[in-house]
Structures are given as structure tokens and as C-alpha cells.
């Protein structure tokens, strides 16, 4: 919720742009909160591409990521990419000199990218920054036969992976959002179940610490399922298979771009049950994707009008 208070003197002398001064800023602030909450979901995304520390600023950077989408059975239409302002500026500079009708004009005049390399590209200040765990050692899978079934993993789409070989000291080695591959564990197309030729990337869902002997159990996604309708990989990892961290160097922060399938996230909103009466007036408006309630009341002591803007999502 957001709240604003408007004094009687302001309403009388200087308050002639109600929509511009109150409604639009409050709606924008609510939209930014939603955008930030969506960006904060990034640790659950297990596909990963690119070189940490090198912003994606080429056609190939986006197109290669799109190839991973296609190999993974995702739809070609409706793909979206969300970049930091710095990355968006680099893409705009890349295409402003081209002769694609419309896109180059937007890139030149407004530093906007639009549809490019198979994605609808957007600029956001909420592009997340990921800080890699402290890592350390030579992490290995500890024990074979760690595949799971769909029945055991379907509710969380995750599993525990037992590893060792970390530096022999208790420490928080992996952070939520760290991504890694396992030697000889390849992704499969979900429809054909044929290997894509790409090592499956796994994300860590919660911070994981090693013990004094260098053992660590991580909660990862996707689960390692080697057969059936929901197969995720071509084979389960062998004992002592090596883990390779893809998200960057120890304890280093990197800005991320988020590339999404149109069905990646469901935004669900519904009206709040707000009681009326006792001087409180509430108006609820439902838009295409969200619902906002605006409640107002007057402070009898100060004559200030208080307005509260609420959204549930």
C-alpha cells in the first residue's frame, strides 16, 4: 500500500493537477513494486547463458539465448527480455544505424530497442544483481543414483543434491540464484526426450553451506528426472562428477538480464475486502492485469485528506 496526505491549503491554492500529482505517481509506484517483486523471482530460473561481467550487447547474445529457449521446447512467439538501462543503451546503439523500419528510429530517438533477435526488449531499473556465493574447493557430486521421480518433485520442481569437495571449512558456499552444470548431464527436449547437446544448467534455490569436511547439500531446480513424460536430463550424474559454476567468480556481483517465455510467471490480482463507513470511502478499479483500491478519509483535526492506494498480487 501507498499513502498520501493532502492539506486543505494545498487543495485550495495549488492543487489543480490531481491526476498528474497524485494518481499517476501512486499508480507508477505500485507498478514498480510489482515489477521489483517479479524481478526478485530470478533465483528460480535455471536456464542461464552468457559470460558474467560481459553485458549482452550483440545480436548473437540474444539469439543464442533464444536457441536455448527453442531447444527447451518453449514457444517462439511472445518472448520477452528485460535489461538494465546500461544494457538497453548498448542494444539501442547497436541497431540505431540499421535500416529496419521502425526499430532504428526508436533506437535513435528514444534509446528503445523493441522487437529484436526474437525478443520484445524492455528496459527496467529492476534488472536484478546477483552476488555469487563464496565457492571454494573442487565441488563434486557425492554419490551416484541421485535422480528423482516426477512424483516426488512435482510440487516444488526441486530436489536435494549431495556434493563434496568444497573447501574443508564451514562457510556459505552457494547463494540462491547460483547456477551450475554437472559433467555429462545434458538437457533434453521435453517433447522428444532427445539430448539438446547442451549441459543442463541447475539453479540453487536457497543458500547452502559446507560443513568442516567440505560436504554440502544444495536444493536445486530442475530436478534430475531421467525417464518418463517429465524427463529433464539424459542421465543422472556419476559419483564424483564435477560441478562448474556458471554465474561468475566468488563473492562477485553481476547485473542480470531476464529473458522470459510468456508463460513464465503468473501475475494474479484480486480486489481487497475493504470495509466502508465511518468516514472511509473506497473505489476499486480492475484493469487488464491488476486491481487497485483507493480509500480516502478526512482528518477532522487538520482537515487533511488522506488517500491510501492498495493492490493485492
Kindly label every feature range from the protein language model.
Residues 9-16:
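Second-shell loop/turn segments in exported
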Residues 4:
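Acidic/histidine-rich, surface-exposed loop or edge segments in extracytoplasmic proteins
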Amino acid at each position: 500500500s501507498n499513502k498520501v496526505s493532502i492539506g486543505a491549503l494545498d487543495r485550495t491554492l495549488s492543487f489543480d493537477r490531481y491526476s498528474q500529482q497524485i494518481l499517476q505517481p501512486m499508480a507508477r509506484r505500485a507498478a514498480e513494486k510489482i515489477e521489483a517483486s517479479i524481478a526478485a523471482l530470478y533465483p528460480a530460473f535455471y536456464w542461464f547463458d552468457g559470460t558474467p561481467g560481459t553485458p549482452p550487447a550483440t545480436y548473437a547474445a540474444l539469439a543464442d539465448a533464444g536457441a536455448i529457449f527453442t531447444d527447451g521446447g518453449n514457444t517462439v512467439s511472445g518472448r520477452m527480455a528485460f535489461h538494465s538501462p546500461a544494457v538497453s543503451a548498448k542494444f539501442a546503439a547497436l541497431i540505431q544505424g540499421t535500416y529496419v523500419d521502425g526499430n532504428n528510429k526508436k533506437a535513435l530517438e528514444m534509446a528503445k530497442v523493441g522487437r529484436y533477435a526474437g525478443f520484445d526488449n524492455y528496459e527496467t531499473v529492476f534488472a536484478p544483481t546477483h552476488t555469487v556465493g563464496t565457492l571454494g574447493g573442487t565441488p563434486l557430486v557425492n554419490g551416484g543414483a541421485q535422480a528423482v521421480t516426477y512424483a516426488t518433485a512435482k510440487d516444488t520442481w526441486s530436489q536435494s543434491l549431495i556434493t563434496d569437495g568444497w573447501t574443508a571449512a564451514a562457510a556459505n558456499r552457494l547463494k540462491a540464484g547460483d547456477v551450475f552444470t554437472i559433467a555429462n548431464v545434458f538437457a533434453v527436449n521435453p517433447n522428444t526426450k532427445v539430448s539438446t547437446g547442451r549441459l543442463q544448467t541447475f539453479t540453487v534455490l536457497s543458500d547452502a553451506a559446507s560443513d568442516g569436511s567440505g560436504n554440502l547439500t544444495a536444493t536445486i531446480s530442475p530436478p534430475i528426472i531421467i525417464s518418463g513424460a517429465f524427463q529433464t536430463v539424459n542421465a543422472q550424474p556419476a559419483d564424483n562428477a564435477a560441478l562448474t559454476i556458471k554465474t561468475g567468480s566468488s563473492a562477485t556481483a553481476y547485473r542480470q538480464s531476464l529473458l522470459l517465455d510468456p508463460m513464465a510467471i503468473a501475475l494474479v490480482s484480486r480486489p481487497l475486502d475493504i470495509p466502508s463507513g465511518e468516514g472511509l470511502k473506497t473505489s476499486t478499479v480492475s484493469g487488464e492485469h491488476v486491481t487497485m483500491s483507493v480509500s480516502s478519509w478526512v482528518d477532522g483535526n487538520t482537515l487533511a485528506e488522506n488517500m491510501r492506494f492498495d493492490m493485492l498480487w
